[in-house]
A protein has these predicted regions:
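N-terminal secretory signal peptides that target proteins for export/translocation
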Residues: 1-2
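Sec-dependent N-terminal signal peptides
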Residues: 5-16
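Structural preference for beta-rich elements and adjacent junctions enriched in aromatics
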Residues: 19-286
Length: 288
Protein backbone atom coordinates (compact mmCIF):
# COMPACT_ATOMS: atom_id res chain seq x y z
CA UNK A 1 0.00 0.00 0.00
CA UNK A 2 2.80 2.40 0.89
CA UNK A 3 4.56 1.70 -2.40
CA UNK A 4 1.37 2.46 -4.34
CA UNK A 5 0.91 5.72 -2.47
CA UNK A 6 4.51 6.80 -3.12
CA UNK A 7 4.19 5.88 -6.80
CA UNK A 8 0.90 7.82 -7.06
CA UNK A 9 2.40 10.86 -5.31
CA UNK A 10 5.43 11.07 -7.57
CA UNK A 11 3.30 10.47 -10.68
CA UNK A 12 1.07 13.41 -9.81
CA UNK A 13 4.12 15.51 -8.94
CA UNK A 14 5.69 14.67 -12.31
CA UNK A 15 2.52 15.46 -14.27
CA UNK A 16 2.07 18.81 -12.53
CA UNK A 17 5.67 19.83 -13.12
CA UNK A 18 5.65 18.51 -16.68
CA UNK A 19 3.22 21.28 -17.61
CA UNK A 20 4.78 24.05 -15.51
CA UNK A 21 7.27 26.67 -16.64
CA UNK A 22 10.69 26.53 -15.00
CA UNK A 23 12.31 29.94 -14.64
CA UNK A 24 15.87 29.00 -15.57
CA UNK A 25 16.93 31.19 -18.51
CA UNK A 26 16.69 28.32 -21.00
CA UNK A 27 13.26 28.86 -22.66
CA UNK A 28 12.99 25.14 -23.31
CA UNK A 29 9.22 24.85 -22.78
CA UNK A 30 6.91 24.68 -25.83
CA UNK A 31 5.03 27.78 -24.63
CA UNK A 32 8.05 29.91 -25.52
CA UNK A 33 8.09 28.58 -29.08
CA UNK A 34 4.60 29.95 -29.71
CA UNK A 35 4.95 33.11 -27.61
CA UNK A 36 4.43 36.59 -29.04
CA UNK A 37 7.69 38.38 -29.80
CA UNK A 38 9.09 41.67 -31.08
CA UNK A 39 12.49 43.22 -31.81
CA UNK A 40 11.68 46.93 -32.28
CA UNK A 41 14.20 48.24 -29.73
CA UNK A 42 15.75 51.69 -30.17
CA UNK A 43 18.78 53.31 -28.54
CA UNK A 44 17.59 55.75 -25.87
CA UNK A 45 20.96 56.26 -24.14
CA UNK A 46 22.59 58.04 -25.77
CA UNK A 47 19.30 59.57 -26.86
CA UNK A 48 19.63 58.96 -30.60
CA UNK A 49 16.77 56.52 -31.29
CA UNK A 50 19.18 54.70 -33.60
CA UNK A 51 19.05 50.99 -34.33
CA UNK A 52 20.97 49.29 -31.47
CA UNK A 53 24.40 47.77 -32.01
CA UNK A 54 23.14 44.46 -30.61
CA UNK A 55 19.81 42.86 -31.48
CA UNK A 56 17.30 42.14 -28.71
CA UNK A 57 14.26 39.88 -29.01
CA UNK A 58 11.51 40.02 -26.38
CA UNK A 59 8.86 37.32 -25.86
CA UNK A 60 5.78 37.15 -23.65
CA UNK A 61 2.73 35.05 -22.78
CA UNK A 62 0.43 34.49 -19.78
CA UNK A 63 -0.99 31.52 -17.90
CA UNK A 64 -2.78 30.94 -14.60
CA UNK A 65 0.35 31.81 -12.60
CA UNK A 66 1.08 35.17 -14.18
CA UNK A 67 2.74 36.94 -17.10
CA UNK A 68 6.02 35.62 -18.49
CA UNK A 69 8.64 37.71 -20.27
CA UNK A 70 11.92 36.69 -21.85
CA UNK A 71 14.77 38.59 -23.50
CA UNK A 72 17.23 37.09 -25.96
CA UNK A 73 20.15 39.52 -25.79
CA UNK A 74 22.51 38.97 -28.72
CA UNK A 75 26.06 39.83 -27.70
CA UNK A 76 29.45 38.03 -27.84
CA UNK A 77 30.31 36.26 -24.61
CA UNK A 78 33.49 38.31 -24.14
CA UNK A 79 31.33 41.47 -24.11
CA UNK A 80 28.86 40.16 -21.55
CA UNK A 81 29.26 41.68 -18.08
CA UNK A 82 28.31 39.79 -14.91
CA UNK A 83 27.95 41.15 -11.38
CA UNK A 84 25.92 40.25 -8.32
CA UNK A 85 24.71 43.17 -6.23
CA UNK A 86 22.33 43.96 -3.36
CA UNK A 87 18.63 44.04 -4.15
CA UNK A 88 17.38 47.33 -5.64
CA UNK A 89 20.89 48.52 -6.46
CA UNK A 90 20.85 50.73 -9.57
CA UNK A 91 24.52 51.45 -10.16
CA UNK A 92 25.77 47.91 -10.76
CA UNK A 93 28.41 47.09 -13.35
CA UNK A 94 26.39 44.48 -15.20
CA UNK A 95 24.18 43.90 -18.23
CA UNK A 96 20.50 43.93 -17.34
CA UNK A 97 16.93 43.74 -18.61
CA UNK A 98 13.97 45.82 -17.47
CA UNK A 99 10.25 45.06 -17.62
CA UNK A 100 7.96 47.94 -16.64
CA UNK A 101 4.24 47.10 -16.66
CA UNK A 102 1.09 49.18 -16.35
CA UNK A 103 -1.35 46.38 -15.53
CA UNK A 104 -4.43 48.60 -15.83
CA UNK A 105 -3.30 50.41 -18.99
CA UNK A 106 -4.30 53.79 -17.57
CA UNK A 107 -0.87 55.44 -17.05
CA UNK A 108 -1.41 55.79 -13.29
CA UNK A 109 1.33 53.47 -12.08
CA UNK A 110 4.02 51.32 -13.64
CA UNK A 111 5.79 48.45 -11.88
CA UNK A 112 9.44 47.82 -12.70
CA UNK A 113 11.08 44.38 -12.60
CA UNK A 114 14.80 44.26 -13.40
CA UNK A 115 17.35 41.44 -13.42
CA UNK A 116 21.08 41.67 -14.10
CA UNK A 117 23.35 39.14 -15.75
CA UNK A 118 24.34 37.78 -12.36
CA UNK A 119 20.77 37.08 -11.21
CA UNK A 120 20.40 40.08 -8.91
CA UNK A 121 17.06 41.87 -9.01
CA UNK A 122 15.48 45.25 -8.51
CA UNK A 123 11.84 46.30 -8.33
CA UNK A 124 10.38 49.79 -8.23
CA UNK A 125 7.37 51.86 -9.25
CA UNK A 126 6.74 54.82 -11.57
CA UNK A 127 3.95 57.34 -10.94
CA UNK A 128 3.14 60.76 -12.43
CA UNK A 129 4.61 59.63 -15.76
CA UNK A 130 8.25 59.19 -14.65
CA UNK A 131 8.45 59.81 -10.90
CA UNK A 132 10.52 56.85 -9.68
CA UNK A 133 10.68 55.11 -6.28
CA UNK A 134 12.44 51.88 -5.29
CA UNK A 135 10.64 51.67 -1.93
CA UNK A 136 8.33 48.99 -3.35
CA UNK A 137 9.22 45.29 -3.16
CA UNK A 138 7.29 42.29 -4.43
CA UNK A 139 7.54 38.53 -4.85
CA UNK A 140 8.41 37.62 -8.43
CA UNK A 141 10.94 35.47 -10.24
CA UNK A 142 13.71 35.96 -12.78
CA UNK A 143 16.74 34.05 -13.97
CA UNK A 144 19.49 34.68 -16.51
CA UNK A 145 21.79 32.35 -18.42
CA UNK A 146 24.81 33.11 -20.59
CA UNK A 147 25.50 31.47 -23.95
CA UNK A 148 28.28 31.88 -26.51
CA UNK A 149 26.68 34.60 -28.65
CA UNK A 150 23.81 35.78 -26.47
CA UNK A 151 22.36 35.71 -22.98
CA UNK A 152 18.78 35.13 -21.88
CA UNK A 153 16.66 36.53 -19.07
CA UNK A 154 13.38 34.90 -18.08
CA UNK A 155 10.69 36.49 -15.86
CA UNK A 156 7.55 35.30 -14.09
CA UNK A 157 5.44 38.15 -12.75
CA UNK A 158 2.56 36.63 -10.71
CA UNK A 159 -0.96 37.96 -11.07
CA UNK A 160 -1.10 38.92 -7.39
CA UNK A 161 2.02 41.08 -7.51
CA UNK A 162 -0.10 44.26 -7.64
CA UNK A 163 -3.75 45.40 -7.47
CA UNK A 164 -5.52 45.24 -10.83
CA UNK A 165 -8.84 46.47 -12.15
CA UNK A 166 -11.28 43.69 -13.01
CA UNK A 167 -11.49 43.11 -16.76
CA UNK A 168 -14.23 41.18 -18.54
CA UNK A 169 -13.48 38.95 -21.48
CA UNK A 170 -10.73 36.51 -22.46
CA UNK A 171 -7.99 39.12 -22.85
CA UNK A 172 -6.51 41.90 -20.74
CA UNK A 173 -4.78 44.87 -22.35
CA UNK A 174 -1.65 45.96 -20.52
CA UNK A 175 1.04 48.44 -21.48
CA UNK A 176 4.76 47.88 -21.12
CA UNK A 177 8.18 49.41 -21.55
CA UNK A 178 10.98 46.87 -22.06
CA UNK A 179 14.62 47.85 -21.87
CA UNK A 180 18.15 46.48 -21.99
CA UNK A 181 21.30 48.07 -20.61
CA UNK A 182 24.48 46.91 -22.36
CA UNK A 183 27.26 47.70 -19.91
CA UNK A 184 30.23 47.20 -22.25
CA UNK A 185 28.82 49.80 -24.65
CA UNK A 186 27.18 51.95 -21.95
CA UNK A 187 24.00 51.96 -24.02
CA UNK A 188 20.33 51.45 -23.18
CA UNK A 189 17.87 50.00 -25.69
CA UNK A 190 14.12 50.35 -25.23
CA UNK A 191 10.92 49.20 -26.85
CA UNK A 192 8.96 51.29 -27.80
CA UNK A 193 11.86 53.78 -27.69
CA UNK A 194 11.09 55.62 -24.43
CA UNK A 195 13.56 57.36 -22.13
CA UNK A 196 12.97 56.82 -18.40
CA UNK A 197 13.98 60.40 -17.63
CA UNK A 198 11.66 62.09 -20.11
CA UNK A 199 7.99 62.86 -19.62
CA UNK A 200 5.55 61.64 -20.80
CA UNK A 201 6.68 58.10 -20.05
CA UNK A 202 3.88 55.90 -18.66
CA UNK A 203 1.30 57.14 -21.15
CA UNK A 204 3.53 56.21 -24.10
CA UNK A 205 3.96 52.53 -23.22
CA UNK A 206 3.53 49.77 -25.80
CA UNK A 207 0.08 48.14 -25.71
CA UNK A 208 -0.04 44.35 -25.39
CA UNK A 209 -2.86 41.85 -25.04
CA UNK A 210 -2.46 38.85 -22.73
CA UNK A 211 -4.86 36.13 -21.69
CA UNK A 212 -7.07 37.40 -18.86
CA UNK A 213 -6.41 34.61 -16.37
CA UNK A 214 -6.28 36.75 -13.25
CA UNK A 215 -8.85 35.57 -10.71
CA UNK A 216 -10.08 37.16 -7.52
CA UNK A 217 -8.67 35.39 -4.49
CA UNK A 218 -7.82 36.22 -0.91
CA UNK A 219 -4.25 35.73 0.25
CA UNK A 220 -2.71 36.34 3.67
CA UNK A 221 1.05 36.40 4.28
CA UNK A 222 2.52 36.65 7.79
CA UNK A 223 6.15 37.57 8.45
CA UNK A 224 7.03 37.20 12.15
CA UNK A 225 9.95 38.86 13.89
CA UNK A 226 11.62 38.29 17.25
CA UNK A 227 14.19 40.36 19.13
CA UNK A 228 16.16 39.46 22.27
CA UNK A 229 18.18 41.95 24.31
CA UNK A 230 20.36 41.29 27.31
CA UNK A 231 21.41 44.22 29.50
CA UNK A 232 24.59 43.07 31.19
CA UNK A 233 24.87 46.30 33.19
CA UNK A 234 21.42 46.13 34.79
CA UNK A 235 21.20 42.32 34.53
CA UNK A 236 17.82 42.11 32.79
CA UNK A 237 16.53 40.65 29.57
CA UNK A 238 13.79 41.64 27.17
CA UNK A 239 12.07 39.73 24.37
CA UNK A 240 10.02 41.49 21.70
CA UNK A 241 7.75 39.63 19.30
CA UNK A 242 5.84 41.08 16.39
CA UNK A 243 5.53 41.00 12.65
CA UNK A 244 3.75 42.09 9.51
CA UNK A 245 0.55 40.77 7.94
CA UNK A 246 -0.19 41.39 4.26
CA UNK A 247 -3.82 40.71 3.34
CA UNK A 248 -4.71 40.68 -0.36
CA UNK A 249 -8.48 40.99 -0.14
CA UNK A 250 -9.00 40.93 -3.91
CA UNK A 251 -7.46 42.35 -7.07
CA UNK A 252 -8.21 45.92 -6.05
CA UNK A 253 -7.71 45.98 -2.29
CA UNK A 254 -4.82 45.22 0.03
CA UNK A 255 -4.32 45.83 3.74
CA UNK A 256 -0.99 45.75 5.58
CA UNK A 257 -0.85 45.28 9.36
CA UNK A 258 2.15 45.88 11.62
CA UNK A 259 2.22 44.22 15.04
CA UNK A 260 4.52 45.60 17.75
CA UNK A 261 7.03 47.31 15.42
CA UNK A 262 9.23 48.69 18.21
CA UNK A 263 12.40 46.71 17.70
CA UNK A 264 13.73 47.94 14.39
CA UNK A 265 12.70 44.94 12.24
CA UNK A 266 9.64 46.12 10.34
CA UNK A 267 10.61 47.62 7.01
CA UNK A 268 7.57 49.90 6.74
CA UNK A 269 8.38 51.63 10.03
CA UNK A 270 11.77 53.34 9.99
CA UNK A 271 10.97 55.86 12.76
CA UNK A 272 10.10 53.85 15.86
CA UNK A 273 13.17 51.91 16.94
CA UNK A 274 13.85 50.16 20.22
CA UNK A 275 17.01 51.74 21.63
CA UNK A 276 17.60 49.05 24.20
CA UNK A 277 20.85 48.71 26.09
CA UNK A 278 22.55 46.05 24.02
CA UNK A 279 22.15 48.16 20.89
CA UNK A 280 22.99 51.65 22.08
CA UNK A 281 24.79 51.58 25.40
CA UNK A 282 28.57 51.99 25.08
CA UNK A 283 30.25 52.38 28.50
CA UNK A 284 33.17 54.77 28.45
CA UNK A 285 36.20 54.36 30.71
CA UNK A 286 38.09 57.55 31.52
CA UNK A 287 41.71 57.51 32.58
CA UNK A 288 43.41 60.44 34.30
Amino acid sequence: MLKKFIYFFFTIFYIVNLHSITIDGELSEPEWQGANSFTDFLTIFPDTLDTPKYKTEAKYFADEKGIYFAFINYQPKEKQTFQKHPRDSFYANADRNYVIIDFNNNANIGYEFTVTLGNSIRDAIFVDENDFSDEWDAIWYAKTKSYEDYWISEFLIPWDVAPMINVEGPYREISVSLARWTFSENEVYNSPGLNFYKSPFLSKFKKLQVRNLNTQKTRIDFFPYASFTNNFIQDNRQINIGGEIFWDINQNSKIDFTLNPDFGQVESDDVIVNFSAIETYYPCLLYT
